[in-house]
Amino acid sequence: MTTNAAPTKRSILLINGPNLNLLGTREPEKYGSETLSDIEENARRQCNELGFDFEGFQSNHEGVIVDRIHAARTDGTTAIIINAGAYTHTSVAIRDALTGVRVPFIEVHISNIHAREPFRHHSYLSDVAQGVIVGLGTLGYTAAIWSVVEKLKQGGFS
């Protein structure tokens, strides 16, 4: 029996939180010289080469990030990669949104949050994330995309 069903679309959503819109000019000694646009363009290219759609999203507002995570539940998002910025250390709301939508996610940080100020050492996301990548600079985004694709090839996240 032949079906005409469309293939399932695979899509990666990259969420960046507060102040990450300033990448390239904000503390380049910690975050490097790449802009958010550079990161998103590299991620889009990598996703497309691997057969995935890509959406980049950035907001400085916690509720807007929560709303975008909620939308991922029904918009075809296969996986989320999130750098929640400072909200990593403060936002139970973002944690609850991520666990509530049941879309697998990987937490990424450009700098090593464990080698910085003590208040940055705790993440509200790490213990519910499928993976955490810190301290690799913007290469962490590339590693996260590769990890998502490889996990899905192996049958998905458990």
Curated annotation (Swiss-Prot):
Residues forming the catalytic site: 31, 109
Catalytically driven reaction(s): 3-dehydroquinate = 3-dehydroshikimate + H2O
Keyword Lyase found: yes
Pathway linked to the protein: Aromatic compound metabolism; 3,4-dihydroxybenzoate biosynthesis; 3,4-dihydroxybenzoate from 3-dehydroquinate: step 1/2
UniProt GO BP: 3,4-dihydroxybenzoate biosynthetic process; quinate catabolic process
Keyword terms, alphabetized: Lyase, Quinate metabolism
Major enzyme class: lyase
UniProt xrefs under CDD domains: DHQase_II
GO molecular function: 3-dehydroquinate dehydratase activity
This protein's record includes keyword Transmembrane: no
Binding locations of substrate: 83, 89, 96, 110-111, 120
InterPro entries assigned to the protein according to its UniProt record, in alphabetical order: DHquinase_II, DHquinase_II_CS, DHquinase_II_sf
Site (described: Transition state stabilizer): 26
Family membership: Belongs to the type-II 3-dehydroquinase family.
PANTHER family, sorted: CATABOLIC 3-DEHYDROQUINASE (PTHR21272:SF3)
Function: Is involved in the catabolism of quinate. Allows the utilization of quinate as carbon source via the beta-ketoadipate pathway.
Quaternary structure (record): Homododecamer. Adopts a ring-like structure, composed of an arrangement of two hexameric rings stacked on top of one another.
The protein's name in its UniProt record: Catabolic 3-dehydroquinase
